[in-house]
Each structure stands twice: as C-alpha cells, then as structure tokens.
C-alpha cells in the first residue's frame, strides 16, 4: 500500500505508535481523538495483518477492541495474510475473528495468489474516492483479463481446496523447524 503517498496527500496530523505496542496506540488515539474532536475530523488507524519482515501478526483483535473506547476507522494492509491466514484464507482478520470490524481491507494478488494487482475492500464511497483521487490510480489501467481470470480461479481454489492451504502450512512449519534446527535465527514468527 502506498502509505507515503497517503501521508503526503492528506492534510491531517500523523501520529505513529511503536510496532504492535497497544499501550502506545492507546496514547496516540487519545491525542488523535482530542485533535479530531476539536477540528471536526476523523481518525484512521493503519496497520498490517502480518508484518512481512518479522512475520508476526498485527494485534487486530486488540485494536478492534479499542473501538469501544475511541472512534476511528481501521485500515489493514494484509498483503502477507490474505490467502494464507484464516479458515478460508480471507486474512489475518478472519484468523483473529475480527474481519468484519476492519473498515478498509487492502491486499495484493502478488503474494499468495501468484499474480499482479491488488484490491481494496471497503465502502463504495471510499473506493470511488480512491479510484479517482489517488495519484497512483489516475492513469492506471485495469488488470489484464488473463490475470483477472487467474485471480478468480485461485480464489475459487481457496474456497474449494482447503487442503492446499493446509499443505502450505505443513511446508512452512517444516522449513521453520529445519532452519531453527540448523542454527538459523528466524525470530519469533507466528506466520
């Protein structure tokens, strides 16, 4: 997701919280909410479903729980979770039981789907705004039809062949265990 483009193009204030630090997020939400209330604005929390480099999961369930105390929208970039996490492969939100509480869901077809392109799942109004206002989309073309058909077929396989995802996890665990056994430090990945 082109975060830098998003940050440069918006007129609001940006608050950053440390990686997966929920107390840090809470403090920033207090600051952001106070400012948003004063300026009649809104708050958008951006995180990842699976953090690509360390491989740990975003604490989406804990972030969603904060919606009881703060008013904000949640954008999840789940490039590494879509197709691999959750019962149906819908992503990390599904895996953690909060997929329906994610306001803006972004993922790519380039990772688990072995294709090109990406998608945003959200309200129609937001999609229309992004489509016609994001610099990266103004002169963009639609995906080539063979790539669309390929993505649709892979989505169908995700739904109808759960054994493929199970095999992926079997191979993943074998690789992780083999690397650890041979002295490689692969961190504390849970993906």
State where each predicted segment sits.
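Short beta-strand
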Residues: 17, 43, 106, 140-141, ...
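Helix C-cap/helix->beta junction micro-motif
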Residues: 10, 69-70, 182
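Short, structured coil segments at secondary-structure junctions
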Residues: 9-11, 101
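Short, small-residue-biased leader/transition segments that mark boundaries at the very start
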Residues: 2-6
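Conserved PLP-dependent catalytic core of the aminotransferase class-I/II
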Residues: 58, 145, 152-191
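Conserved core segment of the aminotransferase class I/II
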Residues: 104-106, 113-162
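Active-site phosphate-binding strand-loop segment of PLP-dependent enzymes
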Residues: 15, 19-76
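Conserved active-site segment immediately N-terminal to the catalytic lysine
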Residues: 70-71, 91-109, 128, 132
